[in-house]
């Protein structure tokens, strides 16, 4: 919103002309997308920096809440970021659920093991490899003073497992679990 404001301000528009429209802005689908009437957020964060930024945003937005993060890392991709993302999650979130992202041809448990190498022993870490089951469990067990970040896939509507591309949406699964 601030970038939009500054851009239009540079074009010579006044605050009175700009501000009424700012309330109508929403982020792109899957980018810090809050599910209606909930403390559940969906974000495409699939890099260490993006995960850190999303979790830090939630910590700021919900200072009194416990933060739960659900994420995985893609297979056949940068293995070096997995341990780093585990470390970021364990330093920022109060609890972690590790799951599949797009494992592609890699063994999903092996990907999770790489992430686990970065987490602290004392962290509350759960592993639920089936992403749909993981999201349903996270949504259904979310406490009143907890916020959930479902990270990694954001707006995507497919999941790649082995050589198959399956229809899958974090947003749809989370919304169905809410209802």
Please give the residue ranges for each predicted region:
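ATP-dependent carboxylate-amine ligase
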Residues: 3-179
């Amino acid at each position: 919103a601030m970038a939009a404001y500054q851009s239009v301000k540079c074009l010579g528009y006044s605050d009175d002309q700009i501000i009424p429209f700012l309330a109508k802005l929403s982020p792109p689908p899957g980018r810090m997308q809050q599910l209606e009437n909930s403390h559940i957020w969906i974000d495409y964060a699939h890099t260490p920096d993006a995960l850190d930024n999303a979790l830090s945003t939630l910590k700021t937005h919900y200072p009194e809440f416990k933060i739960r993060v659900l994420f995985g890392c893609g297979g056949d991709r940068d293995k070096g970021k997995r341990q780093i993302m585990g470390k970021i999650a364990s330093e920022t979130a109060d609890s972690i659920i590790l799951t599949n992202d797009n494992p592609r041809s890699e063994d999903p448990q092996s990907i999770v093991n790489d992430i686990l190498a970065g987490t602290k022993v004392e962290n509350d870490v759960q592993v639920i490899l089936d992403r749909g089951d993981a999201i349903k469990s996270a949504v259904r067990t979310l406490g009143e003073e907890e916020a959930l970040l479902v990270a990694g896939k954001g707006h995507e509507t497919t999941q790649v497992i082995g050589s198959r591309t399956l229809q899958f949406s974090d947003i749809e699964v989370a919304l169905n679990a809410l209802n």
